[in-house]
Swiss-Prot record:
Species this chain originates from: Bos taurus
List of residues that carry Phosphoserine: 9
Keyword Ribosomal protein: no
Keywords linked to the UniProt accession: Acetylation, Nucleus, Phosphoprotein
Positions of modified residues (N-acetylalanine): 2
Highest taxon of source: Eukaryota
Protein name, UniProt field: Protein FAM118B
Compartments reported by the entry: Nucleus, Cajal body
Stored PANTHER family: PROTEIN FAM118B
Family (UniProt): Belongs to the FAM118 family.
Amino acid sequence: MASTGSQASDIDKILGFFSDGAPPTKKPRKLLPSLKTKKPRELVLVIGTGISAAVAPQVPALKSWKGLIQALLDAAIDFDLLEDEESKKFQKCLHEDKNLVHVAHDLIQKLSPRTSNVRSTFFKDCLYEVFDDLESKMEDSGKQLLQSVLHLMENGALVLTTNFDNLLELYAADQGKQLESLDLTDEKKVLEWAQEKRKLSVLHIHGVYTNPSGIVLHPAGYQNVLRNTEVMREIQKLYENKSFLFLGCGWTVDDTTFQALFLEAVKHKSDLEHFMLVRRGDVDEFKKLRENMLDKGIKVISYGNDYADLPEYFKRLTCEISTRGRSAGIVREGQLNGSSTAHSEIRDHST
């Protein structure tokens, strides 16, 4: 019997199965040395639609610009705010993939008749309908992503997003932590954020749905910031002196708002060191993206072949970076303790 048990044990080892019969996990993607050696305070996290879509995949408005406009249009139709001909016109534009910024602008204008007071418009109602009850729609794997972002924030990383939602702020509140949502209408706060005086604030460069009057779809919408040389100088210094880490962003660097804020006045971009985490996906597309981004000083890194690989990869990266930030100037023993603490904190919050 003992021999049979031993043989079974050997077979189990050969097959690589654990005691519960589960198959072995695939080998995790290695962390890039030039990224994992960063400290949190050296990073600016850029959160794109891919993160929101991963956190609450059942909300179509979080997945893309087109999804958001369609959701706003559906809400407007449900509230009987558009004539039949108007709704057909907007649907046709969406179906034909017309300039989405222009479509969104026209829809907002239609929902904001003859007034600049957003409180008296229907646009606000439609926004709140689209983003209603986001807390209940977050999935656990998405919460793990948000916990990693929050952990880096608390250790000194800055965070900006192109998204209109406040998923990160909602998650933080659920953890008993208060984050502030900023938009480009408040120059003073934007300046303080860029100067690292408001580290627990999230800068929404397109605005956030809880403040409809701060939503901008085009650089013309925040000329106050673009004309403020002090604010722009501080913002551009971030791109020159820190490492931006793009999460769920894809082609965010082609976004006109992002370009106006960070790229247009920055010279020698290829000498900088920024990072973009993306799914490996199509080999040719991945190669093309990597080549294009290098000219902008951005290293494109694959976190895996599947979207589901991102939470675990980013968790490992966060633990590594947080350890280095916490143990700067501390003996090696302190580094090991810090690593254990970082893993423990993230694990505790994500359960």
